[in-house]
Amino acid sequence: MLAKDFLFMKNIRITIEYDGTGYAGWQRQAGSFCTVQGEIERILSQILQEDIRLAGAGRTDKGVHARAQIATFKSRSSLGPDRMVHSMNALLPNTIRISDPLVVPEGFHARHSAKEREYRYFVREEPSAVLGRFSGCSYGSLDLMSMNRVASYVLGEHDFSVFSKETRDRTGCLCRVISCKWFRQREFFVLRISANRFLRSMVRYLAALMIDSGKGLLSPEEAREMIESGILTRQLVPAAPNGLFLWKITYGSDSHSF
């Protein structure tokens, strides 16, 4: 038995920022797909000489970015957290950065302990060769008031299954949206939305619904009916992934708040 097998098993939490453009999403996948989780696990396993498996707070889709993804993993390594992160950043591609390493209580879990997740969606009215990597485009003017009227209807608990790629039965599709609002930030229209949980691609579908209302393609009342009835009255294409960021994860005081 190796000496390190006798070392105390630590639960380590890290914050991850990434440009999701070149990745097939966050979650590890079988085959040759390059994912953010897969890249970090590969480098961590190499550094710590252990088989490392991450648990992430959010499972972002292909092309979606993160400002502050949270992940936890277990390790027996004696390597200090700060030195570990320094080594990770030296070996990871420059599209992934790790920060704020912290040893947390055994019961803390990046996903299960999360109380609230915040996403932001950035969209411009005109395409940009430079900014397009990190923003969607409406290809036309947007009415902020109409978008925020629809945003107000999103608040509260709803079955969002029609606004997702979720394959589970409808009983698992209830989400409680805590905040939802659009604001202007220079040339961007920015959606800030937070909830206790999100379904797969849910933010992108809701962003598309609100953007369509802002373009005058559907009325806020029609959008409200779709949200409340759970029935789409027209085809809805999810907003482009490049405009979406996992922005913040909030934890309760009973499980550490970061």
Curated annotation (Swiss-Prot):
Substrate binds at residue 119. It catalyses: uridine(38/39/40) in tRNA = pseudouridine(38/39/40) in tRNA. Its EC number is 5.4.99.12. GO terms for molecular function: RNA binding; tRNA pseudouridine(38-40) synthase activity. Homodimer. It comes from the Bacteria. Disulfide bonds: none annotated. Formation of pseudouridine at positions 38, 39 and 40 in the anticodon stem and loop of transfer RNAs. Keywords: Isomerase, tRNA processing. It comes from Chlorobium phaeobacteroides (strain DSM 266 / SMG 266 / 2430). GO terms for biological process: tRNA pseudouridine synthesis. InterPro entries: PsdUridine_synth_cat_dom_sf, PsdUridine_synth_TruA, PsdUridine_synth_TruA_a/b_dom, PsdUridine_synth_TruA_C, TruA/RsuA/RluB/E/F_N. Belongs to the tRNA pseudouridine synthase TruA family. This is tRNA pseudouridine synthase A. The active site is at 61 (nucleophile). PANTHER family: PSEUDOURIDYLATE SYNTHASE, TRNA PSEUDOURIDINE SYNTHASE-LIKE 1.
